[in-house]
Amino acid sequence: MKPDELPEFIGETGHFSTIFDFSAHTLTDGEHGWYDAPKLEFAKWRAAIIQAQLETQKYGFKANIIENHDEPRGASRFLPSYAQTPEGIKMLGTVSLLLRGIPFIYQGQEIGMRNAKWNSMEEFDDISTKDQYHTAREAGLSDQEALEVCSRMSRDNARTPMQWNDEKNGGFTKGTPWLKVNASYEEVNVEDQEQDADSVLNYYRKLVALRKSDELKEVFTYGEFLPEYENMDGIMAFYRKDESKCILVAANFGKDAATMKLKSGIKKVWLSNRAEEMADCEADTLNLRSCEVVVLELE
């Protein structure tokens, strides 16, 4: 949607209260199909989110998503391989949920589900995935290459059964599920994460509670979005700011540690995805390790 169309759709007299923001998702759309889809570039992903946030806040709210039933798993799509870990998944979730707008969490996202491993096209159910396979083959890709494309981009990745425990079929059913269960269910499931205080699931609970807390719900709901450190490679950072509070959300998507100069002193560290270690903060300096995210209140 073009920026000048936003008032018509989500303004005070617009058609809708909100619309989903797919600006980052379209970055991996291919010109002719999935087979020529470009790899995600962090700088373009960051720029797309920032642009959407700055344009939308003039008129209303968009609904922010990492994934849904029509998209592959966000952890596999938006994170480089080295960041597809519990810490990296928590980092991605923090950035998404604390943007200005209405946050959505899709089933399985809160435990860090990633794309499944598909061994043949017969395992897919989605008709569009099968169409994309044939498009890739007609473009000259081998059977294995076309399968890899579909494995990466298919929405069936988000439609595998919810992983409740490490029992057969992930505890979802004793019958035959419509799709095979993601093989990760033995390591990634609700039951195990319920018992781990540092799990992705329990982190998401902290994150949601923080956004809804009496102290911060106003600034996270109505506060202005202001990007920061855009000149730093691998850093996604922004302020949520109103008349009474200035919150900095800073995430390091890069492989190497990064140091940022803060504009003011730190009043409080509200959240970090490194539970075993406090965020490395000095009076006016923030040091972030790879895949680390912090939520700070500044003076």
Describe the predicted segments one by one.
Residues M1-E299:
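Active-site and adjacent substrate-binding regions of carbohydrate-active enzymes
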